Amino acid sequence: MSDIQIAQANEATEMKSITAIAEQIGLQATDIEQYGPYKAKLNFQAINRLKEKEDGKLVLVTSINPTPAGEGKSTVTVGLGDALRQLDQSAVIALREPSLGPVMGMKGGATGGGYAQVVPMADINLHFTGDMHALTATVNTLAALIDNHLQQGNVLNIDPRRIIWKRALDINDRALRQVVIGLGGPVQGMPRQDGFDITVASELMAILCLATDITDLKNRISKIVIGYNYDREPVTVGDLEVTGAIAMLLKDALKPNMVQTLEHTPALVHGGPFANIAHGCNSILATQTALKLGDIAITEAGFGADLGAEKFLDIKVPQLGKTPDTIVIVATIRALKYNGGVALADLTTENLDALKAGFSNLAKHIANMQRYGVPVVVSVNEFTSDTAAEVQLLQDLCQAMKVTAVPTSVWANGGQGGIELAKAVLAALQQPKAFKPLYDPQADIKSKLTTVVTEIYGGRDVVFEGKAINQLKQIEKNGWAHLPVCIAKTQYSLSDDPKALGAPSDFTIHVRELIPKLGAGFIVAMTGAVLTMPGLPKKPAALNMDVTADGQISGLF
């Protein structure tokens, strides 16, 4: 059966009411705002009350660089939570919510897979509780207010050529990357060049995921740089005097969403910035709440450990105020063979030499996570084509790095297939940790970028090209150089070349643009050819989707 068929078969008979799920973790009906029988948001009264409780342990799930062969990071995250509860551990999962763009594009659903899913699967993947739509409307409201300011006299002297705030849609639409607006004469607005980002790449998504309450949300929104005036001085949302209106539109989206897994493990699914073009972590409020509601909180970071995990550890952790107690790296034998040079069509054939060669990618991610001083466990997400010899070789290679590699079959077997992984994680949680940040935020921008490139990616250096050269000077002039860096980079390689698999070295990262995100609290460095508005593939996942006369969805994944 497909993922959606498995989800639908179980949803019809097995789902508990969301109030029952809330009761499992000590919440009352008055603590949640229901969106039907199986979805809810936690209200701020409950969140504030929970602040008095001690934090549980934090487990971060990440992976090797993604490949067409698939890794199953979200699936393992869900399955690990289910497995821990089977071992009588109080576990709560904290995930990102899916973006409609990838759902309809290349990826399909984003709620785990097989018998390790969060449900209601179709609802979560499509419109869920409306957070993405609220964000999209808010991004575009701000854009409209900026253009209205230009039209109504431009008191702030904003230079239309230097507006950096873009509109947004939660879909993949390459035709909207560059647009011209305001055509048609004086009453139609000020003509200027504009563009669209996908909603999850917008700074407002990052802010939603980093804000700790409405006051913090408003403070961050007020700092957003929307562009520059004719004297090349920054203009902020606060200068426009619309902070309150923008925050108002996000007041409900700020509340974490609660659902359940197929095995009734509570799951907080909230926020969804991409890790290749944003910081790639779910909301701080969801993670903090999971830490209060369970003895163990399991969360994930997007794409490979070079992107999502690095940003989790260097951007989110300082603001979360909690470091991971264990890091799980998800890998598959198929993906490692792909990194070792095997073609997609041949990945089901045993190939120990290719596995050993492709292990270089996993080895680099293991070393990187160990660099932060946190215990590491490897989850080997099983496929039927894996051979005993391949599994043994991978375990031996990991053991040589003093890391336990555990075969995991949660897609096929749910929590039961993650019991050994859960035991390994529980053992790792008992190990000492000595968290070490990667860099000093007070260092200059180039030093911080160079540290990430040399220490995490394995490269040689960083060069600034095109607009980035003057933007670096502007950032330094405006006193923003103390902010952490968020590198926008291809997810498919440790380098900025998506075709450089394994563990490339001695390469240069090319920074073409530096974008200050003062509300989020970091500087985005655009590298390579990465885009903030994706396009659809030749055969988008949407081609396989349908809905029956009675509302039954098919083909979602």
From Swiss-Prot:
One of the GO BP terms on file: tetrahydrofolate interconversion
Molecular function (Gene Ontology), one example: formate-tetrahydrofolate ligase activity
Ligase listed as a keyword: yes
Class of enzymatic activity (EC top level): ligase
UniProt cross-references to Pfam families, sorted A to Z: FTHFS
Catalytic activity entry: (6S)-5,6,7,8-tetrahydrofolate + formate + ATP = (6R)-10-formyltetrahydrofolate + ADP + phosphate
Coiled coil: none
Keywords: ATP-binding, Ligase, Nucleotide-binding, One-carbon metabolism
Residues bound to ATP: T67, P68, A69, G70, E71, G72, K73, S74
Pathway recorded for this protein: One-carbon metabolism; tetrahydrofolate interconversion
Assigned EC number: 6.3.4.3
Family, as annotated: Belongs to the formate--tetrahydrofolate ligase family.
Protein name: Formate--tetrahydrofolate ligase
The species this protein was found in: Latilactobacillus sakei subsp. sakei (strain 23K)
The gene coding this protein: fhs
